[in-house]
Amino acid sequence: MAISKGDKVRIRREESYWHNEVGTVASVDTTGKYGVLVRFEKTNYFGMQGTDNGNLTNSFAESELDRA
C-alpha cells in the first residue's frame, strides 16, 4: 500500500482509542513493527481529565491503516 508522510489514513486497530478515526501520517519508519506515526486532531483519554495534556500521536503498523 506504500503509506507515506502526509497521507490521510483511517485507523483499523479495534483496541485503539482512534479506531475508525482519520489522522495524518507524521513519519514512516520501516525498521520496526509499528513504524507509522500518525497525528490526530483530538487528544486521547489522557487529555480528558481537566487538563489540556494528552496524546495527539500514536504508532501503528501499516497493516492497521487504510488510506482515507
Curated annotation (Swiss-Prot):
The keyword Thylakoid belongs to this UniProt entry's keyword annotation: yes
Keyword rRNA-binding annotated: no
GO biological process: photosynthesis
Pfam families (alphabetical): PSI_PsaE
InterPro entries linked: Elect_transpt_acc-like_dom_sf, PSI_PsaE
Subcellular location: Cellular thylakoid membrane
GO CC terms in record: photosystem I reaction center; plasma membrane-derived thylakoid membrane
Keywords per UniProt: Membrane, Photosynthesis, Photosystem I, Thylakoid
Membrane topology field: Peripheral membrane protein
Transmembrane segments: none
Alphabetical list of NCBIfam families matching this protein: PRK02749.1
Family: Belongs to the PsaE family.
Function, in words: Stabilizes the interaction between PsaC and the PSI core, assists the docking of the ferredoxin to PSI and interacts with ferredoxin-NADP oxidoreductase.
Name the record gives this protein: Photosystem I reaction center subunit IV
Annotated gene: psaE
